[in-house]
Amino acid sequence: MNIKMLFTFPLTLAATCATAQTFHYPKAPQNNTIDTYFGTQIADPYRPLEDDNSIETQRWVTAENELTRHYLDRLPMRPKLLKRLKEVANYEKIGTPFKRNNTWYVYKNNGLQNQSVLYKMDKLGGTLYEVLDPNKLSTDGTVALKGISFSHNGRYLAYVIARNGSDWQEIYVKDLTTGKDLADHIEWAKFGNAAWCGDGFYYSAYDAPSNHAFTSKNEVHKIYYHHLGTAQKEDRLFYQNPAYPLRFYAVTVNKEETIMYLTESGEGSGNNLYVRDLRNKDSQFIQMTNDMNCHYEPVETIGYDIYIFTNSGAPKNRLMLANLAKPGIKDWKELVPESQNVLNDVTFTHGKMVLNYSKDASSHCYLYSLDGRNEGEIKLPSLGNASFSGDRNDVECFYSFSSFTTPGTVYQFDTNTKTSRIYSQPKATFKQNQFVTKQVFYTSKDGTRVPMFLTYRRDLKLNGKNPVYLYGYGGFNIALQPYFSSMRIPFLEQGGIYVQANLRGGSEYGEAWHQAGTKMQKQNVFDDFIAAAEWLIANKYTDKHHLAIVGGSNGGLLVGACLTQRPDLFQVCIPQVGVLDMLRYHRFTIGWNWAPDYGTSADSKAMFDYLRGYSPLHNLKKGVSYPATLITTADHDDRVVPAHSFKFAATLQACQGGKAPVLIRIDSKAGHGAGKPLSKQIEEQADIYSFILANMGK
């Protein structure tokens, strides 16, 4: 969408105080669209806003952005918050080193660079030499690096970029001996990396869209093989399955180029797995699994032994061992059985395995032998989030550790002594010891025990009037663990409390916890979030006049649903890039892929009724006094299309019966969030904090 100043919208403001304004909201384009679901008619008056290319929609977007900017830019705390956000983000950030073809690589950000830069080292800890700087690919940081893949001979680097936050990807190839890019260029790739094999690589893509590239439904995912030195139009179609147009396909190849895996996903919460013996050029794929409701991931191949991470027969995950000779699941052997804690991932290093578990939403890691023997727990600094990096043939093993107030610190782990030492530690731009984090457990509506983290200043008086930023997600088997973001620090310094609730729908306690927040149990997620808010009020951390709820994507749905169900409970609501139209979400881009978690309005009358019962867009009521609401979206969000936020904003503005503002912030040259330039992140967070605090009377 081209968001330009198509006309100047006259703003009428009643007073100079930003929170005491009379809002004359822009008139949104409407029509008389009515859809019929199982005999029930549902009006969709703002359907024209689904066309983000129309002149009417662009005019409305421009007018809404003018109104929003006029409000936000006048908030007295914004300059101070913006300045502090830049200060706390301005520190050197170094990732975990990794080795490819006997060369060490690392990502580094000098401080306020929009994107981190890939470097190589002459030796571990040695001089850094620039390999790839995404900041040089655009003037404003809106080209992001989405993935890299080294050829098995070490000469080439295929790198994947995305422009303006879109899910659409392009692939380029760099010759590491000369440092120059080849002429090879792949467009319209999506959801996959380059898988090297022979003199080229495999990649996943869709046909080039004829129009509406950022909203039209993506169908028939294909795998191509690209031979270096040729044009994309000459690429060989390697695999497609038109019988199942709503599935994703991707291949990976082991480093010896003896085994290829094909992953098929998209119609269930898991995937199918296929394997092919590349030693025999006439070999075909052999199906290893046939259950799209379970997850199967080949995490390592040693010879013809295949180590597979799965939740099949193990809701909290386990590690299985297969062999190319008999690869079917019935011949697999259990290597590490399911534990009482959730297994998150497995890293191979120096002839060992590191198994990373989650216990009450924090990392607990253990060293294992290759035959599945537990050799002891790896001591971590505190409650937090650890991420390991290593190679089965390398002595060196690293992990990054962070918590809510601990910036990512890289440790080198010795598998022989089972000890860690700091490899790199950032210099904090704030006083870390002034904050405290505690974990509490509260009871949800149906009696379920739910964990929650709270972070705040040690000297904070819990007087029941502290500003609270309550964050949640609750979906798609994704766990929220403690992790560091400098963006939180200014809010905490202002006396705010950051709260992260571990709702059902995530993976905090395995597949059962996930399923308890899906389809016709989705209300559990909203009940968990509402119960978290009520617990915070009952325990004198805050009151309803100082409580903000925030969530993005599926978390935006969470905020939208809670806003409509309990408008009396919250002072401020921030639904970010949210799924807000639950009756039509599956009609756009890859929305169909979310059906295993949500169900669709076409599944059955019962499913339609359930979705209609909580869909944020369809549960707004005229004349209700809704909380102050700042809706955020972006023009290039082709994951959750901006139409969700557009229609929700227009409807909420028309329904608002109170005096609290209802604004929408529509970013340009941005997408769903991944790869967003640091400068844009800082500007957005300054807007959010200033909006929250202003509407709490701060």
Model-flagged regions — what are they?
Residues 135-148, 161-166, 180, 413-419, ...:
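Cap/lid segment of the alpha/beta-hydrolase catalytic domain
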Residues 500-698:
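Active-site-proximal cap/loop segments of hydrolase catalytic domains
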Residues 109-116, 138-142, 161-170, 185-189, ...:
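A flexible loop/linker signature enriched in serine peptidases of the S9 family
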Residues 55-149, 160, 247-277, 283-301, ...:
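Non-catalytic accessory segments flanking enzyme active sites
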Residues 130-193:
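A conserved hydrophobic secondary-structure block that centers on an alpha-helix together
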Residues 120-121, 172-176, 219-229, 274-278, ...:
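Beta-propeller blade signature
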